Amino acid sequence: MQKMRTLGEFIVEKQHDFPHASGELSSLLASIRLAAKIVNREINKAGLADIIGASGNDNIQGEEQQKLDLYANEKFKAALEARDQVCGVASEEEDEAVAFNKELNKNAKYVVLMDPLDGSSNIDVNVSVGTIFSIYRRVSPVGTPPTQEDFLQPGNKQVAAGYVIYGSSTMLVYTTGNGVNGFTYDPSLGTFYLSHENMRIPENGKIYSINEGNYIRFPTGVKKYIKFCQENVPEDGRPYTSRYIGSLVADFHRNLLKGGIYLYPSTQSHPNGKLRLLYECNPMAFLIEQAGGLASDGVHRIMDIKPTELHQRVPFFVGSKNMVHKVEEFLETYPD
């Protein structure tokens, strides 16, 4: 029987894949692993503790912050600061980027951008939620505080990205630009084990994931694509199946494994889309491309978009390569 590899062992094995390998990125990923375990523990007992429901505060996007959002945000910040590999973080839950002021942190080479708890409004109904993270090498001089430019880098500059999905089992999925690998958490041992090696998304899928309750507000091209998905064309594998959980990590994870497309287009009320380029779209785009899929805003490759602000939003289409190409065709054919 083949020995099961832990996340820690796998990271060490793959360390030579990292440019300028020095062990720092390995240690940074270990910090994320630790914070994920802590957050997973709290999520699993959320119904028994006073940490579900809203905190009474809004984040910078004007969205009501959930108590676990804030808890996860603090735990990930603390874990990342403690190891001295990160000079600062930008979080969906913070108005501005946070610089770590310890001298060792100023000498760190990396910044982290994160959505500490995606889909947190679903916790009280026991739906899967997740953490999304993105890692960049800083562009400002080492030894100085991080600058805005360190965080406003296009997705094609990411050195690592991933997510943790807290569901029926907890998984950590990540890439460093050399494929995508998934690790399942064994709570009895407190260890992540390699369970999904070299994950690949099928070029064609049969699942489309979109909140069809907003159909009337969608661009014409997206409406036409939805009708295309629903057409009865058995020789082409249609109609496709509609599956939408409302938690990006959960919808993305299913489509990565099964093949499919996730769509969050612009609407009349959100002309730039609703998902955040830096905290959600870029890391998911890096993962999907490494798994053989595509991510687009309907016109441009997501990872080629140059960010102009920390909380920038974009339309988002991500998943199986041929499905993303098809929705781009509809958007080009039916411009609004």
UniProtKB/Swiss-Prot annotation:
GO terms for biological process: fructose 1,6-bisphosphate metabolic process; fructose 6-phosphate metabolic process; fructose metabolic process; gluconeogenesis; sucrose biosynthetic process. GO terms for cellular component: cytosol. Binds 2 magnesium ions per subunit. Substrate binds at D118, G119, S120, S121, N211, Y244, Y262, L263, Y264, K274. Its main location: cytoplasm. Its EC number is 3.1.3.11. Mg(2+) 1 binds at E92, D115, L117. GO terms for molecular function: fructose 1,6-bisphosphate 1-phosphatase activity; magnesium ion binding. This is Fructose-1,6-bisphosphatase class 1. It comes from Vibrio cholerae serotype O1 (strain ATCC 39541 / Classical Ogawa 395 / O395).
